[in-house]
Amino acid sequence: MASPRPLRRIPAAPARARLKERYEDAATIYGIPYWGKGFFHISEDGELVVRPTREAARGVALKQIVDEVALRGITCPLIIRFPQILASSVASLNEAFARAIDEYEYANVFRGVFPIKVNQKRVVVEKIIEAGRQYGYGLEAGSKPELLAAIAADLAPECLITCNGYKDEAFIRMALNGVRMKKKVVLILEKVSELDRILSVAKLRGVRPLLGMRAKLYARGSGKWAKSGGEAAKFGLTTPEMLEAVKILKSRRMLDAMVMLHFHIGSQITDIRKIKLAIREAGRVYAKLRALGVPIQYLNLGGGLGVDYDGSKTAFDSSMNYSVQEYANDVVYTIKTICDEENVPVPTLVTESGRAVTAYHSVLVTNVLDVADRIEQDRRVRVTSGDAPVIQELAAILSSTNAKNLRESYHDALQYKEELFTLFNLGHLSLEDRSKGEILFWHICERIHRDLKTLKEVPEEFEDMEKMLADTYVC
């Protein structure tokens, strides 16, 4: 992608200084250096720049794109996709595992799959397939249309197609047809009852299936989807159910069909400690199954690899306290250690990462229709001796607020704000009185916020004041 075209002449020195201030303000307010992951950047004139390959020389200003498509008659709202970001994300994930495998001398490989349900756009899936071909990167399907698309996709021979979700006879037949076509289509058991159905259809079709089973681990994830894992999870086989499935396969001389162990403890896992616990438990389950003679080849860690949406690098729901490389290192090291202890071969590692691959690649652009100001700068009130005492008290606080009494002024303002609404609800104040009181309160907050910038340390109770005073954009 070409570099941004210069849209204006180089400004004079004082103007350049102002632009630098704009850049620093934008970077601070929007936090792009923290969550942009190298794909997004603020230019020196304060514009948002996208770097699809993370190379500064190949960046493009988002405004420039919007202006150019507007010349073609395309107006907002619109979605701009950057396929290069998809390719970069696929490469980052696979190369992180490659580095970990090399560092820890892991005697097997990584074979990731992309869950089609995360983004079913054909252009997205095809770009991921193209970018992942050199890594043997496959697909995950959870419905018949997705499975049909996965089987028809131009995947490399070593690529996996994993099948999760509900499996009726039509779905099973479709998967078995894929196996007949020499595709590595793995049907993952979510319930023991699915096994008899799969084996019956496979016998009728004359195809030996490739099977996996989803373990219901004791370990749980973190974040909004933590309940997807743990003992109360909706899907997955308990330990007795896994042993029952093994017994059924042994009795039918089809134990060699069980090639994958799978688990999933939730999407957007925010805390690496939860991931480590799940990996350790799943590694032991894998090793014990191998010791029982189950020839599992793949350990599928499911999804959950997070995205640091807010750039805080914490375990909050909108963030993650680990990197992709740390994730890969922990997976490889933990599984290798357990397999060495149990004297079993290490499995091929599989993940079903979706959001971590696609989250950054598209940008929604929309027009701002209006701005709702919390405080209208030109709105002032005139307080007289005839005004209610609560109004006069708020006016006095406003006039006396300074850097030395910010906390006291704020506490007093909150008290009189409560009194204002109480008196209004009791019928002792007019609508005009209430309006005056509200305006005075917000002007007090604005003055406090302004004076906070002069302090070295901001008191904890004022940390959310910037959000409280923020304008609301109507899009």
Per-range role (PLM):
Residues 2, 8-54, 58:
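N-terminal basic/disordered segments at the start of proteins
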Residues 37, 42-120:
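Low-complexity, highly charged intrinsically disordered N-terminal segments
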Residues 258, 265-475:
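C-terminal active-site-proximal or functional interface alpha/beta core segments in diverse enzymes
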Residues 29-32, 38-41, 67-71, 152-154, ...:
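A general structural signal for short secondary-structure junctions and capping/turn motifs
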Residues 104-300, 305-307, 322-326, 334:
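Active-site-proximal beta-alpha core segment in soluble small-molecule metabolic enzymes
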Residues 3-6, 27, 34, 218, ...:
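Charge-rich, low-complexity N-terminal segments
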Residues 77-80, 87, 189, 318, ...:
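Intrinsic disorder
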Residues 84-92, 244, 281, 330:
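A non-catalytic, amphipathic alpha-helix used as a structural packing/dimerization or gating element
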